[in-house]
Amino acid sequence: MTQTYLTLNNGLKMPQFGLGVFLVPDGKETIDACLNAFKLGYRHIDTAHAYQNERGVGEAIKQSGLKRDEVWITTKLWPSEYGEGTTLQAIDKMLERLQTDYIDLLLLHQQVGDYLGAWKDMEKAVKFGKVKSIGISNFKENLEDLLSHTTIKPAAIQVECHPYYPQHELKMRMAEFGTVLESWYPLGHGDTKLLNEPILKKLADKYHKTPAQIILRWHIEEGNSVFPKSTNQAHIQENFDIFDFALTDEDMQQIAKLDCGKRYYTADLEEQKRFLSWKPAD
């Protein structure tokens, strides 16, 4: 099995497939999940300050024996860390938690708060060598405002994306900047309706795979970066077992028919402002 890579708009090559650790408890559970993934060939971990498990990710990399430049770390700043001056301090704390000298990809986790001040600090962090690439997550209503105030354009945008909601319009908008789309809820938030779609079951039979593996391969073919979350060793292995086949153009056209604009996360900008009242622990 061969890991695939995406070239970002700054020329860096990012492993396209990785392990997500959202809601994975810090400590042994995060460390074990990451170590199991590394043994199988995973080289990208997607975490966040809000996930409260960056320490476990950093410890796993340390224990793995892998060189730092062999593992890609994506992490995210919470709105409580946004603001000129504030964000640079938050990045330093992040580096300590991850036990590393630099972050491969740093994202703004939410589109509320002083994201413009935060972005200025993130651009400084790139200049200082503390961060290699910067991007955004969950930006929609405030996307254009951010784009109009950036010197460095986002290397990646992480949003909900799956066959029911493939984000074609957003991808077209970001194409001029060379921004890569990263998918969360890549399997439709575990919706059995999506996993039981006849076309996915048909393709699963055709390729001797599971419907989930077909969806994950669809993300690869779509050019999305994807990192399904799991702490189960068998699932971690199954999720990664998608590089020994490819979907045909006809397969992709059939899957494209599933696009129905269905989102699982529907909070609007006003509802998202509740994030401003929470502060993750250091």
Regions found by a protein language model. Give the residues of each.
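Short, acidic/polar
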Residues: 25-37, 83-98, 117, 141-144, ...
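Residues at the N-termini of beta-strands
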Residues: 44, 102-105, 133, 156
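CE4/NodB-like, metal-dependent polysaccharide N-deacetylase domain
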Residues: 87-107, 124-128
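A short, structured active-site edge motif that brings together acidic residues
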Residues: 68-81, 104-111, 138
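N-terminal binding-site loop/beta-alpha segment at the start of enzyme catalytic domains
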Residues: 1-71, 187, 281-282
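Alpha-helical scaffolding within the catalytic cores
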Residues: 1-6, 55, 59-61, 90-93, ...
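Acidic-and-aromatic substrate-binding clefts and catalytic sites of carbohydrate-active enzymes
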Residues: 24-28, 46-56, 80-85, 111-116, ...
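Beta/alpha (TIM)-barrel catalytic core signal, keyed to glycine-rich beta->alpha loops juxtaposed to Asp/Glu
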Residues: 110-282
